[in-house]
Amino acid sequence: MALNLQDKQAIVAEVNEAAKGALSAVIADSRGVTVDKMTELRKTAREAGVSMRVVRNTLLRRAVEGTEFECLTDTFTGPTLIAFSNEHPGAAARLFKEFAKANDKFEIKGAAFEGKIQDVDFLATLPTYDEAIARLMGTIKEAAAGKLVRTFAALRDKLQEAA
C-alpha cells in the first residue's frame, strides 16, 4: 500500500521524536526472520524500554536529520529496522545481540551513541545504572578494607619492633 504525503510526514515526525528522546540507536536487517520471532522481539523490546520500527530508508534519513543519529545514514540500505534505547544506552544493543545469537538471519548493521557510530558489542556490555553503582561500591569497599589491613599490618610490625 502506497503512503500518501501526510502518512509519510507523520512517520518522519514520529521517528524524529523517538530519536530526539533516545540515548542510543541500533540498525538491523530482519529479512528471513519469522513473524512469530519478530513479535516476540517487539514484546521483549517494549519491556526493556526500547522502541522499534521498520522504516523506509528515505523516510529514515529525513527523520534522523539533525539528531545525533545522523551518523547512521550510511547503514540505511535494504530493509531497515531501527531500535531506540530510551532508558539505558545499551538496552537495544543487548536485545539485538541476544536475538541475533538465536536467529542467524537477523543481521545487525550498526549502532550509534552520543553522535558517533559505536561497536554493538561495546554498547551491549555497558553496565546499567544499578550495575555501575554496585561496581563503584565494591571498589570503594575493597579499597577501604585494603587500607585497614595495611594499617593493622603496620601497627603489628611497630609493636613487634618495640617488643
From Swiss-Prot:
One GO cellular component term of this record is:
large ribosomal subunit
**Pfam families per the record?**
Ribosomal_L10
Q: Which SUPFAM superfamilies match?
A: Ribosomal protein L10-like (SSF160369)
Superkingdom: Bacteria
Classification via InterPro entries: Ribosomal_uL10 (IPR001790), Ribosomal_uL10-like_sf (IPR043141), Ribosomal_uL10_bac (IPR022973), Ribosomal_uL10_bac_type (IPR047865), Ribosomal_uL10_CS_bac (IPR002363)
A GO term, aspect molecular function: structural constituent of ribosome
GO terms, biological process? translation
Arranged from A to Z, the UniProt key words for this protein are: Ribonucleoprotein, Ribosomal protein, RNA-binding, rRNA-binding
The entry describes its oligomerization and partners as: Part of the ribosomal stalk of the 50S ribosomal subunit. The N-terminus interacts with L11 and the large rRNA to form the base of the stalk. The C-terminus forms an elongated spine to which L12 dimers bind in a sequential fashion forming a multimeric L10(L12)X complex.
Q: What does this protein do?
A: Forms part of the ribosomal stalk, playing a central role in the interaction of the ribosome with GTP-bound translation factors.
Q: What is this protein called?
A: Large ribosomal subunit protein uL10
Species: Mannheimia succiniciproducens (strain KCTC 0769BP / MBEL55E)
